[in-house]
Amino acid sequence: MQIKDILAEIERFAPLPYQESYDNCGVQVGDAGIEATGALLTLDVTEAVLDEAIARGCNLVVAHHPLIFSGLKSITGRNYVERTILKAIRHDIVIYAAHTNLDNVQAGVNRKIAERLGLQQARILAPVKESLYKLYTYVPESQATALLAALFTAGAGSIGEYSECSFATPGAGTFRPSAHSKPVIGAAGGPREIVAEQKLEVIVPKHLKAAVLKTLKENHPYEEVAYELIALENENQTIGAGMVGRLENPMAPEDFLRFLKEKMKTACVRYTAPPAGKIRTVALCGGAGSFLLKQARAAGADVFVTGDYKYHQFFDAEDQIMIADIGHYESEQFTIEIFSEIVKEKFPNFALLFTKTNTNPVNYYF
């Protein structure tokens, strides 16, 4: 099995087009075409992590945070990024990162936090817009089922927790073949044909547009395929930032903070004064999530759990919501479990190892 086979499963789960514009996800170093010996799963890539991969026989390191964020003008070993790259090249190790693309999928980083907190009815806090298309096409009734099956296989027809979604309308299609045509129905240069057809409608994710159209043209019986592809303004409830849900049992603020500290295995929690009453609705965002405070308040959250809050940003709570900063590393430390779950589903016998190296650069003194 080649490394690219493993990475294909990760990208099927968290497509690269879902990453933010500033991000740098995907293969960072190495040749993904080589045979895989084992994968080391980590939040960050450091020299120590590379040493561990070498010692444990892994030639693939899968990380949440990219090692390379911005362009490099030279690789001389003058900092830890360059030294890590050089070490990976010397030992033929592939470094791969799934960052904001994994943040932005429904079953990604934020779902993992929501699961640890036992949130009910968890949903994406800030769904993205303009990431969906509606595809309409017209096909003879006898071949509608086969065409739909091909479109579904290509990724069309998914709406939230439902797949193979479509709508069909019966009708009559007309056409007159030219003398140079090669019609499936009728004859070149013949009279106008009237065919019993179905108008098929399916949703297409933006990142699968090209693949779905290719499938349509390859599987449609007509020489000239009639179709319309229309961009939608609908929110895509399966892609976006953050998550919000409800606790099964509301808690007093102090009890919730104790619960949060235990479940997220964090040394401390920085927080603002809680609003009156119990904590019922919890908004959250793994990593640095201060940009989602407005959405958390709009969702009626009693608390917003995230990391990397700056001093002056805490004032933005305005006593309307409790901000609970558990730390960047702490909020995302369980992300490696997601990588393991993705790969094990397809390759249950492949060697997947969790790093033993603590890559958190922040220490706490009490």
Predicted segments with their positions:
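Hydrophobic structural segments
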Residues: 1-366
